[in-house]
Amino acid sequence: LTERTFPLDHFITSLDSLSHYQTFGIMFAGLHGLFELIPQASLLFGQRLTEQEAGVDDPSSGCIELHDTIQSRLRDWNVSQATTDSFHDKDSMTHVSKAIRHSLEIYLLAAMQGSSIPNAETVAQFQSHVDIVFGSGQKLHQSQWTATLMWPFLIAGSCTTQQDRQQSLSQTLRNSRYRMKHSIRASNLLQRLWDDPDPLMYGPYGLYLAISKHDITFGTL
């Protein structure tokens, strides 16, 4: 775990320092308030894994407090907080924000689970969010907004066990309108995860294991 831990740049947990630029918001399609929760949730995940390595089975009070803070911010967020431009389609933004929010819900659940094999109840919780992420993604097929869906698709895809849905997601990533190599790499990463029979190869922690096992260098928002 320590070999795969990088120093934290606090800049990525709050993007407000960029707000005075005219281009602020464009990179994250106005949804920077959601995207900046991702590295914070990743910090939580790292803390839980460190605790488990030290033999602490249950989440510490610090982890619980951080989880609750992130979840409160996530659930208090609404699309009216997005930094928008006149050309932005409000309906599309609603679908994108829904996909990001529910993939963050998955990530927060997985963070508290840590390296434990998820039970049936947790898997069912994951699946309820997965359905919403992919439902939102289908409404944005081949639109310019798909550029912001890489992270949600990876997180939701890591919890997908239905073969037809796996194939559909793989094709979506490989046939992205932007034809970017990292989309194909994302598809390959998910395929390695899906093909591995190890029960730990599931969810965001499974992605972490797949990246470690196959010595893959991959990062995305």
What are these regions (language model features)?
Residues 5-150, 155-174, 178:
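Cytosolic regulatory protein-protein interaction regions
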Residues 175-221:
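Intrinsically disordered, low-complexity regulatory regions with latent secondary structure
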